[in-house]
Structure formats: C-alpha cells, structure tokens
Amino acid sequence: MTKPSRHFALTPDAIASLPEKDWQAFRPGVSLYPLHGQPPGAQSSALLRYQPGARVPSHTHLGVEHIFVVQGSQEDESGHYPAGTLLISPTGSSHQVASAEGCIVLAV
C-alpha cells in the first residue's frame, strides 16, 4: 500500500489555467492566488500576478520572503529579475516592487 502524496505540482500550464475567480485583489494591478497558509504572521505561500506597469508600494519585510519569478519579469531598486530568478528578502529589508511587462511570482 502506498502512502498518499502530501504535495502537489503546479506546472506552467496549470498556472495558466487557474480559475480567474480564485485570484484575489491584492494591490492595484496585482492579484494573489493563495496556495498555503494564511498571512499575515503565518507561514504561507501564494502566486502574485502583476499586470504590466503594476507596482507594490515600498514595504518592510516582517520575516524572510522568498520570491521566484515564474513568468515575465520584476524589478526593484536593486535590479531587474527575469523568469527563473530567486530573490530572498531578509527580515527588516525594504523595497518597492514593479513589473513593466507583467509577471507571475511565487511568494513564500
């Protein structure tokens, strides 16, 4: 007898076909698709979808944040990050995020 899997895979095709109704407004031009946990204060993960030109105002991280750029590109004061980039923002770090072309990122 095999044990049930405790994980799931989210392929690029699966991300592209996520139901529009399940995306939640997060910031103007940015929507959120919760994957695990309930922020704030809890361990959580979500997809963030930026429309072209969307910005998230300057903010300070209360904990470590990991961002993986899945599609498109994202930028902040420190650089430009194309698909495939992993960003790690330590506790207490601040930045303002934008996406000129639009993107989808995984935030943990």
Annotate each PLM feature.
Residues M1-A42:
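A short, N-terminal "cap"/entry segment at the start of jelly-roll beta-barrel domains
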Residues L32-P34, S45-R49, H66, L86-I88, ...:
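Conserved hydrophobic/aromatic beta-strand scaffold that supports enzyme active sites
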Residues H36, A46-L48, P57-H61, S78-G79, ...:
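Short histidine-centered beta-strand/loop micro-motifs
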Residues Q43-S45, I67, G102-I104:
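Structural motif
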Residues Q51-A54, H61-D76, A83:
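Glycine- and acidic-residue-biased ligand/ion/polar-headgroup-sensing regions
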Residues A54-P57, E75, L87-Q96:
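Histidine-centered metal-chelating micro-motifs
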Residues T91-V108:
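Ligand-binding loop in jelly-roll beta-barrel domains
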